[in-house]
Every structure is written in C-alpha cells, then in structure tokens.
Amino acid sequence: MSKSLGNFFTVREISEKYDLQVLRFFMLSAHYRSPLNFSAELMEAAKSGLERIITAADRLKFLMGSAKTEDMAETEAEKFAKSAEYVGNFESAMDDDFNTADAIAAVFDLVKFINTMTDEDSSKEYLENLFDRLVRLTEVLGIIVDKEDEILDSDIEALIAERQAARKEKNFARADEIR
C-alpha cells in the first residue's frame, strides 16, 4: 500500500465506511506478527463475523427475558460444563503468543454452541451463564456485544459540548460534575 498508488487508507476514512468495532475485529482476525491485507471484502467478512457474535448475544438476552424457568436443569448443567471447552480453547490461543485468530475461532465455536443448545425452553440461569461466558471472552478482545453498556461517541460529544457551555457560563460545579 502506498499513497502514490491510491491504495492507502487512513483510520478516519475507514471509520466513515465501517464501525470501529468492525475494524478492531478485522485487525484481531490475524496474528499480530502476520501481515494484514486490507480489502473491502475482508472488512465485510469481519462485519458479518462480528454481527454473528452480537446476534448470538442479543438472542441470549431475548431468551433470558422470556425464560419460563429460573434454575438450571441437570441436562443444562451438563451442556454448560461442555461449553467450558471453548473457554479453554480461547485461553490456550491467547497463551499461545496472543493468537487472536484462534481465540476468535473459539468464540465462534461458543456462538455455534449457543445457537444450537439454547431455545425458548432454556432456563434463565443457563442463558445468563452462557451470556456471561460469551461477554467474558469478547471483552478480553475489546469487543462489545452488550450494546446497553456501550457509550456512544455522540453521547460523549454531547457531554463535552455541555461541559464547555457550563465552563463558559462559569458554572464550574456543573462542569466538574460532567467531567
């Protein structure tokens, strides 16, 4: 890539087309010591992969809200214990020279498990435990799957503007509160 050939992109240009979470996911999809080729097709693949993970998290939240039973059944406890294998694979990948590509593969294995081993008859405890497990793995990679916890850039910009207005009005107590 070079600027003179016209195949050079800045993060700002990429962020106009793709969410920065997609860019993060794209960059994590390769080992940090491997070269990373940028293309629109690869960014779209990263976008669909990230959406797959977020969709699984959203599905778990939906099922938690409509769960008919609270406590985990014995069969669910056995299934949940099997899902620990994916956590082990994730941790092994991260211990193997920060192999994020393999770690993401373990997350996808967990997503596949979630999609096949949960339904509207699953208990709330089972669903919550799987959700916590998914969030724990994705948070290590800096991927936000729980949109309720995500602070939007527009919210931050609004708070900055409000703080600047309070400082102009010499309302320092309010400016400090916003900070």
Where in this protein do the model-derived segments appear?
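Structural preference for alpha-helix termini/caps and helix-kink/transition segments
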Residues: 2, 6-179
